[in-house]
C-alpha cells in the first residue's frame, strides 16, 4: 500500500503547462479581436490544456477522498473545502464582470445580463445567455461548471460511503453517452451531456491504478476510455474520428507517466515551475481580465507594425508574470478567509495540516500538494456546445 509524503512535482508542472496552453490560445484570440485579425487561432491547443486539467482533477480527488476516508462527516469537510478553494476567486471575477457590464457595458464583450444568468453563474449552474449560448458570465468558468458537478459526485460518494470510482464511473460514462442524444437547442442541463466527463474518469483510473500498483490494468482501462471517446465522436459525426481517440489517449498517457515517473525525475522540476503550477488557478481565471490589455494598448497607439506573434508572446509573458502575484495577494488570501469561515479548526493539535486543510488548498487546477499521507482502501473531441480551447467570453 503506497504512501505519499511529498508533492507530485510532475503533476504540478503539468498544471502550469495546461494553464499556459489556455493562455496562449486566448492571447491569439485577443490579438485577432483587438489588434490583427490575421492572427491564427489555436483552439485545439487550448482544449488540450482543459482536458489535462480535468484528468488531473480526477486523479487528485480520488487521493483526497481516500485521505479523508469514510469517517462520519468526511463528505461535508470535502464539500466545504472544495467551496473554500474554488468559489472566492471565481466569484470575484464574476463580480468584476457584472460591475463592468453595469458601469461600462458598451466596452465589454458579451455584455448582456439577466438575473437568471447572474444567479446561475454564481451557483455554477449551466444557463443560456440572451444569444442562446451556454456559458457563465466569466467565460472560462464553464470548466468549473463541470468541476463542481464532479465534486458533487465525489461528495455524494463520501456521504453514502461508497468508493468514488464505483459511483462516478457509470454516471460519467452515461453523461458521455448522452452526448449522442444532445439536441442542437434545448435545456441548459444538456451542457453536462459531453464526453469530456471521461477525462475525469481517466484521472480517477490513474489514481486507483497508482494506489494498487497495477500499471498494466491501468493502461488497458485508459485505452478503453480512449476507444469509447473515439467511438462517441465517430457516431456523432457519422464518420471515423481516429483523432478523437488519440487525444484522450495522449492526455491519459501524459498524466499516467507523470504519476509513475515522479519519484524518479520529479526532483528535477525547477522551483519556478512549481510556483507556476501553484498559481495556475489564478492564471486561468485572471488572465481574461488582463490579457486583452496588451493588444488593445498597441492598437490604441497605432503600433500595427508589431508582428502578431510578438503581441501574443508579450501577452503570454505578461500573464505568466502576473499570475504568481495574483495568486499570492488575491487568490491565497481569499482562500484563507473562506477556509477560516468554512473549515474552523482545520489545524490539528500537533501542528499538522488536517485532511480538510489539505483539500482546501487544492483547487480544480491543483494537484501537487494534496496527495500526502494517503492510504489505500481496496482495491478528444469536444461536442459542439463546448467552446474550443475554452474561448474567452469574460
Predicted regions: what they are:
Residues 12, 16-19, 50-51, 57, ...:
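Residues within membrane-spanning alpha-helices of integral membrane proteins
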Residues 41, 48, 62-64, 75, ...:
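Membrane-interface helix-loop-helix regions
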Residues 1-10, 17-46, 62-76, 127-132, ...:
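Alpha-helical transmembrane segments in multi-pass integral membrane proteins
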Residues 55-63:
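Central hydrophobic cores of alpha-helical transmembrane segments in multi-pass inner-membrane proteins
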Residues 358-360, 365-376, 385-393:
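Short amphipathic, helix-prone segments within low-complexity/disordered or flexible regions
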Amino acid at each position: 500500500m503506497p504512501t505519499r509524503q511529498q508533492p507530485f512535482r510532475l503533476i504540478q508542472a503539468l498544471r502550469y503547462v495546461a494553464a499556459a496552453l489556455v493562455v496562449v490560445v486566448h492571447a491569439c484570440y485577443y490579438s485577432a479581436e483587438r489588434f490583427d485579425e490575421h492572427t491564427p487561432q489555436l483552439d485545439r491547443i487550448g482544449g488540450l490544456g482543459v482536458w489535462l486539467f480535468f484528468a488531473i482533477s480526477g486523479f487528485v480527488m480520488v487521493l483526497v477522498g481516500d485521505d479523508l476516508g469514510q469517517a462520519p462527516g468526511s463528505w461535508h469537510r470535502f464539500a466545504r473545502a472544495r467551496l473554500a478553494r474554488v468559489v472566492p476567486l471565481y466569484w470575484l471575477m464574476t463580480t468584476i464582470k457584472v460591475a463592468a457590464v453595469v458601469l461600462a457595458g458598451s466596452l465589454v464583450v458579451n455584455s448582456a445580463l439577466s438575473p437568471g444568468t447572474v444567479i446561475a453563474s454564481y451557483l455554477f449552474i449551466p444557463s443560456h445567455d440572451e444569444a442562446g449560448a451556454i456559458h457563465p458570465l466569466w467565460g472560462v468558468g464553464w470548466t468549473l461548471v463541470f468541476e463542481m458537478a464532479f465534486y458533487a459526485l465525489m461528495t455524494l460518494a463520501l456521504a453514502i460511503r461508497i468508493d468514488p470510482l464505483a459511483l462516478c464511473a457509470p454516471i460519467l460514462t452515461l453523461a458521455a453517452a448522452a452526448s449522442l442524444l444532445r439536441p442542437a437547442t434545448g435545456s441548459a442541463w444538456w451542457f453536462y451531456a459531453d464526453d469530456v466527463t471521461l477525462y475525469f474518469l481517466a484521472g480517477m483510473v490513474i489514481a486507483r491504478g497508482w494506489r494498487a500498483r497495477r500499471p498494466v490494468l491501468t493502461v488497458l482501462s485508459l485505452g478503453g476510455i480512449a476507444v469509447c471517446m473515439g467511438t462517441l465522436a465517430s457516431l456523432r459525426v457519422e464518420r471515423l474520428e481516429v483523432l478523437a481517440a488519440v487525444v484522450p489517449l495522449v492526455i491519459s498517457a501524459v498524466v499516467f507517466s507523470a504519476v509513475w515517473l515522479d519519484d524518479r525525475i520529479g526532483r528535477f522540476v525547477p522551483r519556478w515551475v512549481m510556483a507556476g503550477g501553484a498559481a495556475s488557478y489564478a492564471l486561468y481565471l485572471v488572465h481574461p481580465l488582463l490579457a486583452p490589455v496588451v493588444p488593445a494598448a498597441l492598437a490604441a497607439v497605432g503600433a500595427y507594425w508589431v508582428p502578431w506573434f510578438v503581441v501574443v508572446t508579450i501577452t503570454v509573458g505578461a500573464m505568466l508574470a502576473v499570475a504568481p502575484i495574483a495568486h499570492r495577494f488575491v487568490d491565497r488570501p481569499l482562500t484563507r478567509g473562506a477556509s477560516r469561515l468554512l473549515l474552523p479548526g482545520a489545524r490539528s493539535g500537533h501542528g499538522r495540516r488536517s485532511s480538510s486543510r489539505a483539500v482546501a488548498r487544492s483547487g480544480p487546477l491543483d494537484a501537487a500538494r494534496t496527495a500526502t499521507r494517503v492510504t489505500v482502501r481496496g482495491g478528444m473531441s469536444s461536442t459542439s456546445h463546448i467552446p474550443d480551447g475554452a474561448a474567452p467570453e469574460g
